[in-house]
UniProtKB/Swiss-Prot annotation:
Subunit (UniProt): The RNAP catalytic core consists of 2 alpha, 1 beta, 1 beta' and 1 omega subunit. When a sigma factor is associated with the core the holoenzyme is formed, which can initiate transcription.
GO cellular component: DNA-directed RNA polymerase complex
Protein name: DNA-directed RNA polymerase subunit beta
Pfam families, per the entry: RNA_pol_Rpb2_1 (PF04563), RNA_pol_Rpb2_2 (PF04561), RNA_pol_Rpb2_3 (PF04565), RNA_pol_Rpb2_45 (PF10385), RNA_pol_Rpb2_6 (PF00562), RNA_pol_Rpb2_7 (PF04560)
Gene responsible for this protein: rpoB
Keywords, in A-Z order: DNA-directed RNA polymerase, Nucleotidyltransferase, Transcription, Transferase
Length: 1368
């Protein structure tokens, strides 16, 4: 097994029993692949597939003018590189996007020859089509400077669906069947039965009409309609009665209404007897072809065809007419002998279409189409052209109707056709096939569809959603272009005159900026980022709404297995509507979720891996991942637990066709991070998955000692760590950058061969948490491609580290851990274990007002020098200043309106020339309840406005940093070049050179070292080839220098140009404050098993319960939090964590007494290779073993993968290894080593019973008491009611509601109640009165009229009731 540079530093011991057969795929693949398919930016123009932008363009173009003599054709499109990189866009509040240009061709035809079109003129031109936001490498978008995520949508797949109403519509409980044809875009077509068994259709949920109107509209006659849906009985009329053609299966089960005889007249079935199988056999044996029936047997039957008099051509009876005695008389008169009637029965051949045809009053195709037109466009007069146009547009026009590739595939599969491709519009036989299946369902044949089956729901990803928006914009453009195309020739227009890109830009901007599926990225920690991008929502445009979604849609479905996580979903109104993709899930070309399985042939598991969608999976028998497999892949159990078509069953190995790839296949990323998930109740696991996403990154991240082995994948895939793009040697490292000299075999020709990684330092995330990267690599380290070079927020040595490992004791402690409260040791706070840094961004804007421009300045009147002490000469706070609530960060003054001056004042002003207008102080101050350190300031200045000194300094610093990078690259490039040069020059014969080098002298190393490197180029070599090489190297260095100078100039230009600011804004300053949040009572904390609580008390370290060796517990939890909640995983985690730490202590003790390396190696081998997955420690050098041991001193990290974790025996053996009997005895551990004797820190006495103690990975959640604490004395009031606003954000008051009023009434506290309802709330005059009284030193309340009473009076008046106060 290959260990990466970081994995070698600290190996996680895995207890997995099963080998890794399939690596977890890249976790952001769905987002990145979908968007790259949409753009196809890397694909050459000629090879672009018809998907994404290409599909949108080709579906709308060519646009033809109304007269047909001009058309605009699409040739190709190209995307220009973005003007600013991602970081610049975030700083400047811009959108990271690329300009889209399309090459279009305007073709003008000659109007003189309308019969044969002749091209008169062709104009080709590139046209700007708006901006397309680009996806960052981590799958998000930067829109107006903030990172956003486009969530994938789970919607109903296009195609045809059959369902029934479950008997809810009609009081009798009868099942009413219906069918619905859903296109990707276009009109929906519904078919439905009513309680009387008549079949109707409706278009776009409008008024229903008999389905035969639709069938006539597509060109069928009543005869053809009946022929399509019924089989016929043939009768021959005789002078007495008639003869019926004998079809055996049509008679079975019927009651004979007359004696049925064979040809010889022998009675086979007597009258009033039910015809059974024996009777039919007898009739078949008697070779009966016809049965004689009495005439009344024909009465009431329905004619299948029109009956026409052969001589006169007169229609005697129409198809679908009932046979009556008068009809029979007419037939006999016209000497017509053969007639056909419809065969129907009550069991499986209902007369539904026939009875529908009977209520249909339309006569022919045109009448049917007019009826449909009237339903779609009521009130408009139906002309023939309009009727035809509307009907064709409904289902047959490619512009208005698109079934899509998926829809066609699903449709054909459902109606039982073999081919899965076909036209994208609806065909006549599609409508017929749908109605036939619906009638068969009503007849009791076949099954209805399950709409929650993942074969009937598909995922729309970013690319597809963006394509739909782009197409919508293009369609708007098309309308405008059509109008103008007519004038194209007369006005000599070019393509860019025809196309206005605004509709496209606005459609795209609206989608990325304000669509329900475009969400502000959850960036609390790397896991929340990755989960947000893997989320699948059933809400959004074209999806469900919370209110209408029933229980079935939200429920877990058997097809979710391996595709959608059954655990991770929000609590509350969105439960089950927002899901997360399972770990291995993957989208196929149609947008259906697939999951991988291992192929099994003849009871033997192969290495072949197939991805199956929910539809395909139903056809196979699939074994679970925990089935026992021998070395050669044979399934060893007699019966294997497996799934088939959604059912779980035990089958023999020979029936198995596939097998799961991994036990963690069914859960999502967040759920697969919970160790011992299999021992937790599902509801608690749900909370655990959701709360991990809210964990705040700690100051010093610490890897979980008990993990699941997927931590590294999550950390790396989330993009928070820095990965090496190419292998090489680390050349330089500091806190902010890493420079790598790339391996020769990975360097591309003409490339610099240097990779520089600038780390992200103390940057604000969307949730105000801190993003900071710390280098792991040291100078001289050899790294390979993909190795982790630097840790990000919440990662430790390339592994996800959301919390801290705490020594936990499960015991009650003086009621301080009642109801999930948490008791914490002061040591945890003192060591800054849970201290986190939060970064607040504060903005101030200087605008151009009517009274003149606002000014950012240090010169503010009425402010003491103390308050201005932290500002520089530009009026902006220094970096590093520690500020508290109310401190000035940026000084700003705003012009104030002129007050009316008296003539005397005017005179004085005129004489002494005093300032004409006043200014008021509108400086940016630190908001209440906030304090911190200024860590960054950014100044943005509008184009054409003088930059202040501070802004100039910021630009100079940025340029200095950039020059440093370029110099490093140049240093390494030149170093490599001079090394090559030295090797080449050594031993060569010179014709002369600097320092009087004689002709014919051999060049020596000492001579070269004595010379300045640049003077080497002045050496004249005798060998011409070598001289040419010397020139080439000189040129390449010169070229690189020139390139770097150009890059520097480009950067300078970008920085010195004015910033794009909103209209009316002259200058904008952003100040970033770093706020340190220590753990304090009121903060919410949680483990990974849904065991959440609030810190109740921070106890001095000497009062905490401690062990025999004096080690105090960090956290004391209530044992009652475990049994009723059934999350036993936390107890197992604590035991295994205890073993992990114990092993670490033993390794630390070995290193301290400088044990021999063999002893350390042997101990490590014992830990890693006695059970679970073996590690190849023998491949490690002694130095590597030593470094590994040093990193394990704080605990040997364990991995217990979900559903494949550590067993009780393995945990016991690890505890035995960590705590040999002598150590266990000293610690006062029980015999089974699962509990410890604890002592009370306050009395020093031992507690009565032993206590479960161990290490748990505990998280601090983003629900901090600092953000929730809030107090107000006075503040803003609501405009209408004049009552204080509510909530911390509005600086509001506390609500005093109806029930609180009752409480004060019950106490009889009348004065308190009066002031609550008046002066403390909405009595405006009373409020000012109280203030006046207080100033006078008189503490009296004069309560007046509450404003809400006036509002009530006004509201009653608005109802037209004159109400007034009686003011006697």
């Amino acid at each position: 097994m290959q260990y990466s540079f970081t994995e070698k530093k600290r190996i996680r011991k895995s207890f997995a029993k099963r080998p890794i057969v399939h690596q977890v795929p890249f976790l952001l693949a769905t987002q990145l692949e979908s968007f790259s398919t949409f753009l196809q930016a890397e694909v050459p123009t000629a090879q672009r597939k018809p998907e994404g932008l290409q599909a949108a363009f080709t579906s709308v173009f060519p646009i033809v003018s109304h007269n047909g003599f001009a058309r605009l054709e699409f040739v190709s499109y190209m995307l220009s590189p973005p003007a600013f990189n991602i970081k610049e866009c975030q700083q400047r509040g811009l959108t990271y996007c690329s300009a889209l240009r399309a090459k279009v061709r305007l073709v003008l035809l000659d109007k003189e020859s309308p019969s044969k079109p002749v091209v008169k003129e062709v104009k080709e031109q590139e046209v700007y089509m708006g901006e397309i936001p680009l996806m960052t490498p981590t799958g998000s978008f930067v829109i107006n400077g903030t990172e956003r995520v486009i969530v994938s949508q789970l919607h109903r797949s296009p195609g045809v669906f059959f369902e029934h109403d479950k008997g809810k519509t009609h009081s009798s409980g009868k099942l009413l069947f219906s069918a619905r044809i859903i296109p990707y875009r276009g009109s929906w077509l519904d078919f439905e039965f009513d309680p009387k068994d008549v079949l109707y259709f409706r278009v776009d949920r409008r008024r229903k009409m008999p389905v035969t109107i639709l069938l006539k509209a597509i060109g069928l006659t009543p005869e053809q309609i009946l022929a399509n849906f019924f089989v016929f009985d043939n009768f021959t009329l005789m002078p007495e009665g008639a003869q019926m053609e004998f079809v055996p299966e049509r008679l079975r089960g019927e009651v004979a209404r007359f004696d049925i005889t064979d040809r010889d007249g022998k009675v086979i079935v007597q009258k009033d007897k039910r015809i059974n199988a024996k009777h039919i056999r007898d009739l078949e044996n008697a070779k009966t072809k016809y049965i004689s029936v009495p005439e009344d047997y024909l009465l009431g039957r329905v004619l299948a065809k029109n009956v026409v008099d052969g001589d006169t051509g007169e229609v005697i009876a129409n198809a679908n007419d009932e046979v009556t005695e008068s009809v029979l008389d007419k037939l006999r008169e016209a000497k017509i002998k053969d007639i056909q009637t419809l065969y129907t029965n009550d069991l499986d051949q209902g007369p539904y279409i026939s009875s529908t045809l009977r209520i249909d009053e339309t006569a022919d195709k045109m009448a049917a189409r007019i009826a449909i037109y009237r339903m779609m466009r009521p009130g408009e007069p139906p002309t023939e052209e309009a009727v035809e146009a509307l009907f064709n547009r409904l289902f047959y026009s490619e512009e208005a109707y698109d079934l899509s590739k998926v829809g066609r595939m699903k449709f054909n599969r459902r109606v039982g056709r073999d081919e899965i491709v076909g036209p994208m519009t609806l065909q006549d036989d599609d409508i017929l096939a749908t109605i036939k299946i619906l009638v068969e369902l009503r007849n009791g044949k076949g099954e209805v569809d399950d709409i929650d089956h993942l074969g009937n729901r598909r995922v729309r990803c970013v690319g597809e959603l963006a394509e739909n928006q782009f197409r919508a914009g293009l369609v708007r453009v098309e309308r405008a272009v059509k109008e103008r195309l007519g004038q194209a020739e007369s006005e000599n227009l070019m393509p860019h005159d025809l196309i206005n890109s605004k509709p496209i830009s606005s459609a795209i901007r609206e989608f990325f900026g304000s669509s329900q599926l475009s969400q502000f990225m959850d960036q609390t920690n790397p896991l929340s980022e990755i989960t947000h991008k893997r989320r699948v929502s059933a809400l959004g445009p074209g999806g469900l709404t919370r209110e209408r979604a029933g229980f079935e849609v939200r429920d877990v479905h058997p097809t979710h297995y391996g595709r959608v996580c059954p655990i991770e979903t929000p609590e509350g109104p969105n439960i089950g509507l927002i899901n997360s993709l399972a770990l291995y899930a993957h989208l196929n070309e149609y947008g259906f979720l697939e999951t991988p399985y291992r192929k099994v042939t003849d009871g033997k598991v192969t290495d072949q891996i197939d991805y199956l969608s929910a539809i395909e999976e139903g056809r196979y028998v699939i074994a679970q991942a925990n089935a026992a497999v021998a070395e050669d892949g044979t399934l060893t159990d007699e019966l294997v637990s497996s799934r088939e078509a959604g059912e779980t069953l035990m089958v023999t190995p020979d029936r198995i066709q596939y097998m799961d790839v991994a036990p963690s296949q069914i859960v999502s990323v967040a759920a697969s991070l919970i160790p011992f998930l299999e021992h937790d109740d599902a509801n608690r696991a749900l909370m655990g998955s959701n709360m991990q996403r809210q964990a705040v990154p700690c100051l010093r991240p610490e890897k979980p000692v008990v993990g699941t082995g997927i931590e590294r994948t999550v950390a790396v895939d989330s993009g928070t760590t820095v990965q090496a793009l190419r292998g090489g040697v680390v050349d330089y490292v500091d806190a902010g950058r890493i420079v790598i000299r790339v391996n020769d075999d990975e360097a591309v020709a003409g490339d610099v061969g240097v990779d520089i990684y600038n780390l992200i330092k103390y940057t604000r995330s969307n949730q105000n948490t801190n993003i900071n990267q710390r280098p792991i690599a040291k100078v001289g380290d050899k790294v390979a491609r993909g190795d982790v070079l630097a840790d990000g927020a919440s990662t430790d040595l390339g592994e996800l580290a959301l919390g801290q490992n705490m020594l936990v004791a499960f015991m009650p402690w003086n009621g301080y851990n009642f109801e999930d409260s948490i008791l914490i040791s002061e040591k945890v706070v003192a060591d800054d274990r849970y201290t986190s840094i939060h970064i607040e961004e504060l903005n101030v804007v200087a605008r151009d007002t009517k009274l003149g421009p606002e000014e950012i300045t240090r010169d503010i009147s009425n402010l003491a020098e103390v308050q201005l002490g932290r500002l520089d000469e530009s009026g902006i706070v220094y970096i590093g200043a520690e500020v508290e609530a109310g401190d000035v960060l940026v000084g700003k003054v705003t012009p104030k309106g002129e007050t009316q001056l008296t003539p005397e004042e005017k005179l004085l002003r005129a004489i002494f020339g005093e300032k004409a207008s006043d200014v008021k102080d509108t400086s940016l101050r630190v908001p209440s309840g906030m304090s911190g350190t200024v860590i960054d300031v950014q100044v943005f200045t509008r184009e054409g406005i003088q930059r202040d000194k501070r802004a100039q300094q910021i630009i100079d610093d940025e340029l200095k940093r950039y020059r440093l990078d370029l110099n490093d690259q140049l240093r390494i490039v030149e170093g490599d070049a001079f090394q090559r040069l030295a090797r080449m020059l050594e031993g060569k014969v010179a014709n002369g050179g600097p320092k009087k080098l004689a002709k014919g002298t051999k060049i020596e190393r000492a001579y070269l070292e004595d010379l300045d490197h640049y003077h080497w180029f002045d050496i004249r070599l005798a060998d011409e080839e070598a001289a040419a090489q010397l020139e080439a190297i000189k040129d390449s260095i010169e070229q690189k220098r020139h390139q770097f100078d150009l890059a520097f100039e480009e950067k300078r230009k970008k920085l010195t140009q004015g910033d794009e600011l909103p209209p009316g804004v002259l200058k904008m300053v952003k100040v970033y404050l770093a706020v340190k949040r220590r753990l304090q009572p009121g903060d919410k904390m949680a483990g990974r098993h849904g065991n959440k609580g609030v810190v109740s008390k921070i106890v001095p370290i000497e009062d905490m319960p401690y062990m025999a060796d004096g080690r105090p517990a960090d956290v004391v939890l209530n044992p009652l939090g475990v049994p009723s909640r059934m999350n036993v995983g936390q107890v197992l985690e604590v035991h295994l964590g205890w073993a992990a730490k114990g092993l670490g202590w033993r390794i630390g003790e070995m290193l301290q007494r400088q044990a021999r390396i063999e002893e350390v190696r042997a101990f490590l081998t014992k830990i890693y290779n006695e059970s679970g997955r073996a590690e190849e420690l023998e491949s490690f050098s002694d130095d590597e073993i030593l470094e590994l041991a040093k990193n394990l001193r704080e605990g040997v990290p364990f991995a217990t993968p979900v559903f494949d974790g550590a067993t009780e025996e393995e945990m016991s053996s690890m505890l035995d290894l960590a705590f040999p009997d002598d150590i266990a005895q000293n610690l006062g551990m029980t015999k089974s080593k699962n509990q410890v004797r604890l002592y009370d820190g306050r009395t020093g006495e031992a507690f009565e019973r032993t206590v479960t103690v161990g290490y748990m990975h505990y998280l601090k959640l983003h629900h901090l008491v600092d953000d929730k604490m809030h107090a107000r004395s006075t503040g803003p009031y609501s405009l209408v009611t004049q009552q204080p606003l509510g909530g911390k954000a509005q600086f509001g008051g506390q609500r005093f509601g109806e029930m609180e009023v009752w409480a004060l009434e019950a106490y009889g506290a009348s004065y308190v109640l009066q002031e609550m309802l008046t002066v403390k709330s909405d009595d405006v005059t009373g409020r000012t009165k109280v203030y006046e009284n207080l100033v006078k030193g008189d503490h009296v309340i004069d309560a007046g009229m509450p404003e809400s009473f006036n509002v009530l009076v006004k509201e009653i008046r608005s109802l037209g009731i004159d109400i007034d106060l009686d003011r006697n």
